Amino acid sequence: MSRLREKYEKEVVPALMERFGYKNIMQVPKVEKVVINIGVGEAKENPKALEAAVDDLTMIAGQKPVITRAKRSIANFKIRKGMPIGVKVTLRGERMYEFMDKLFNIALPRVRDFKGVSPNSFDGRGNYALGIKEQLIFPEIDYDKIDKIRGMDIIIVTTAKTDEEAKGLLELLGMPFAK
């Protein structure tokens, strides 16, 4: 069992039950999944860029990502329906906890001038979205092997009903929020 999951079961659940006054252990919010998405805009001119993004994401997440395709054609962006425009991966269970542990304790502190993540990035339903400007903050990425600096979106989906509950959950799990 991963370190973060153990922490969730032993420390976070009792703390949240006390803080929000839940009567049943099943009411306590938990992290459902983590979705990581890399938009590869240059994939239409350079198909190799997509492969590089797939490799990066595979190393970061520990599982093979799925290629996302354009839903409709947009002339201004010069894309047609069905063209590959990004890669995403959905983590659940142990892999999700391992990734979050790595994100909170290793990757985020390596961001330049890091003061904490914004406490305003909740969506109103208890999910948290986070943008990262470069993939280099992850320890698996070798600086010499990357072709281009890519950003990514990380969405943490929780079962919390409100943003306040979700923030309490993520704070107790070790998410470094800005004060």
Swiss-Prot record:
Family per record: Belongs to the universal ribosomal protein uL5 family.
Self-association and partners: Part of the 50S ribosomal subunit; part of the 5S rRNA/L5/L18/L25 subcomplex. Contacts the 5S rRNA and the P site tRNA. Forms a bridge to the 30S subunit in the 70S ribosome.
Protein name listed in UniProt: Large ribosomal subunit protein uL5
Classification via PROSITE patterns: RIBOSOMAL_L5
Entry GO MF terms: rRNA binding; structural constituent of ribosome; tRNA binding
Record has Signal as a keyword: no
Function: This is one of the proteins that bind and probably mediate the attachment of the 5S RNA into the large ribosomal subunit, where it forms part of the central protuberance. In the 70S ribosome it contacts protein S13 of the 30S subunit (bridge B1b), connecting the 2 subunits; this bridge is implicated in subunit movement. Contacts the P site tRNA; the 5S rRNA and some of its associated proteins might help stabilize positioning of ribosome-bound tRNAs.
Keywords carried by this UniProt record: Ribonucleoprotein, Ribosomal protein, RNA-binding, rRNA-binding, tRNA-binding
Protein encoded by which gene: rplE
GO biological process, one term: translation
GO cellular component, one term: ribonucleoprotein complex
